[in-house]
């Protein structure tokens, strides 16, 4: 797939909107099992983009092709490499894809990367897909045995009951049946939400003469329009940019809706600043986080002792540090922040290993600090009770009060204002304008406010009213205060150990700052300081 942008000479020319009903399918399977040949047979296009790939007959990076089914449904294929050396490239192609096409050759059977790719599909939570047995003409007597082998290896995975189709790209055997099954699989897939916020993980970035910088990716939700402004967040860039033009299926379009492979022509962005793993986002709609709490969905126990790992999220690959709470739950600290939400899937891989270590489900993208002994074990027990979609009551209770839009950005299923609050909100949560408030805390605040108002009016009976500032200062001075929150919730009391008091490194590791150990050279100064001040000296940063 070329994914090339509109001609730069006519970036504002009228173009029709992209047709809906497109589905993106990523291939998977061991090297040299016929993935690229299968895609070529279905689409009439060569997915391998590089001369070296065609010369060696080996897919190295992601390839792209598309076709239309007789039903009118459109398919866009992402062809991934099968060789173990290119596992990171495979995960970048499979990560954003909603449907998987698992390929196994009849003449070779199940092999090492077959297991790796199966594990990646399971870790990513891809629940829609099919299995294609290729090269039926080369080993017709092994078809039944290969199918039984596939069923055995897929047991307990999302593709356990996936349809299996046998084909031969050489003779054309089974291709008609495959097209029918592709229609059925895409029909069963969940319809994408075109009204959702955009998060387009970038898999390629390049420059086209006369057009400028282009990025490509898989649009799984939301919509993109020419002329609109989006946020570009990445390894070396984070700013708003303008969409100069769009293209899908090699045709210019004014708008792209999901699902789709899309090329986005960006205005005034140097291509050298962009990398695979960057993301185009709806502005002010995504939390950019580097600390998150997760649950294991498959793979090795999280308390197995491995601390330094590589996390694959979308098309991004980021080093992470893992702090296990128990075998099933942990805290991840990312080497760089990413746009993430509750419900996202992560693949963990040990450095130097070509195997999947574990699959993760994101439970919290704004977790509480863990500064006291035993906090990790307590947090593990809390997360064990948390549903996969997040816990609105727990998030509101921890903060006391939080803006509704904040929890929406986190990915929690906050009910729309059009739904009666009494029916949609959990017990213990009340809606106050654009805020969600913990009901027990609200009662305390109301009583505290009444007390403060009465005191102020008694002290100044001629005053026109009580300033809001007085209420805030009164709370901080010792009156009943809101429950401890985060910087995104209600302001905490003055003595609260607040996240903003931590350094950037402390925030990244999810821990509070600790006093530095005094060197032998500085002990005398410390004793003199204590004598002079009459209180314990606290070592901090210079300044």
Identify the role of each PLM range.
Residues 2-80:
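Conserved G1/Walker A P-loop phosphate-binding module
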Residues 25-29, 33-42, 85-91, 109-112, ...:
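P-loop/Walker A NTP-binding module and the surrounding RecA-like catalytic core of P-loop NTPases
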Residues 80-85, 95-145:
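Conserved Switch II/interswitch segment of TRAFAC-class P-loop GTPases
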Residues 83-84, 107-111, 126, 135-140, ...:
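Conserved nucleotide-binding/hydrolysis micro-motifs of P-loop NTPases
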Residues 105-107, 129-144, 165-173, 267, ...:
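G-domain G4 guanine-recognition motif of GTPases
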Residues 136, 152-300:
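Conserved catalytic-core segments of large NTP-driven translation/proteostasis enzymes
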Residues 138-144, 149-152, 249, 269-543:
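C-terminal effector modules of nucleic-acid-centric enzymes and ribosome-associated factors
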């Amino acid at each position: 797939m070329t994914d090339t942008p509109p001609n730069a000479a006519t970036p504002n020319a009228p173009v029709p909107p992209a047709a809906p009903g497109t589905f993106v399918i990523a291939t998977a399977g061991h090297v040299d099992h016929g993935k690229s040949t299968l895609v070529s047979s279905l689409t009439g296009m060569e997915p391998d983009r590089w001369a070296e790939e065609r010369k060696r007959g080996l897919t190295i990076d992601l390839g792209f092709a598309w076709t239309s089914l007789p039903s009118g449904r459109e398919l866009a294929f992402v062809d991934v490499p099968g060789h173990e050396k290119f596992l990171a490239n495979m995960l970048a192609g499979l990560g954003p894809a909603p449907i998987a096409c698992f390929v196994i050759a009849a003449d070779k059977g199940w092999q090492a990367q077959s297991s790796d790719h199966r594990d990646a599909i399971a870790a990513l939570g891809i629940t829609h897909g099919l299995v294609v047995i290729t090269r039926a003409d080369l080993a017709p007597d092994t078809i039944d045995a290969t199918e039984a082998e596939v069923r055995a290896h897929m047991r307990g995975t999302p593709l356990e009951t996936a349809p299996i189709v046998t084909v031969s790209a050489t003779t054309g055997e089974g291709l008609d049946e495959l097209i029918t099954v592709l229609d059925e699989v895409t029909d069963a897939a969940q319809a994408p939400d075109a009204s959702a916020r955009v998060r387009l993980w970038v898999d390629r970035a390049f420059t086209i003469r006369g057009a400028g910088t282009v990025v490509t990716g898989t649009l799984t939700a939301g919509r993109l329009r020419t002329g609109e402004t989006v946020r570009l967040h990445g390894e070396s860039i984070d700013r708003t940019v303008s969409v100069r033009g769009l293209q899908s299926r090699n045709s210019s379009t004014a708008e792209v809706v999901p699902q789709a492979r899309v090329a986005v022509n960006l205005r005034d962005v140097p291509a050298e600043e962009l990398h695979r793993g960057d993301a185009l986002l709806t502005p002010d709609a995504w939390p950019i986080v580097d600390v998150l709490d997760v649950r294991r969905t498959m793979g090795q126990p999280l308390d197995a002792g491995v601390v330094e790992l590589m996390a694959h999220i979308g098309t991004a690959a980021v080093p992470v540090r893992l702090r296990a709470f128990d075998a099933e739950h942990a805290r991840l600290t990312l080497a760089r922040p990413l746009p993430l939400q509750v419900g996202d899937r992560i693949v963990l891989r040990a450095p130097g290993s070509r195997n999947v270590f574990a699959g993760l489900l994101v439970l919290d993208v704004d977790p509480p600090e863990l500064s006291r002994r035993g906090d990790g074990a307590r947090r593990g027990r809390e997360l064990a009770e948390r549903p996969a979609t997040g816990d609105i009551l727990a998030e509101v209770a921890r903060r006391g009060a939080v803006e509704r839009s904040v929890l929406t950005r986190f990915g929690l299923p906050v009910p729309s204002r059009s739904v009666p609050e009494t029916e949609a909100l959990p017990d213990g949560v009340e809606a106050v304008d654009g805020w969600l408030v913990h009901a027990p805390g609200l009662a305390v605040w109301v009583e505290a406010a009444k007390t403060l108002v009465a005191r102020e009016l008694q002290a100044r009976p001629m005053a026109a009213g009580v300033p809001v500032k007085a209420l805030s200062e009164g709370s901080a001075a010792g009156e009943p205060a809101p429950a401890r929150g985060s910087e995104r919730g209600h302001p905490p009391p003055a003595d609260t150990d607040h996240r903003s008091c931590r350094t950037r490194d402390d925030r990244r590791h999810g821990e509070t700052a600790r006093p530095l150990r005094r060197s032998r050279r500085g002990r005398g100064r410390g004793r003199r300081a204590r004598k002079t001040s009459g209180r314990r000296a606290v070592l901090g940063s210079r300044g």
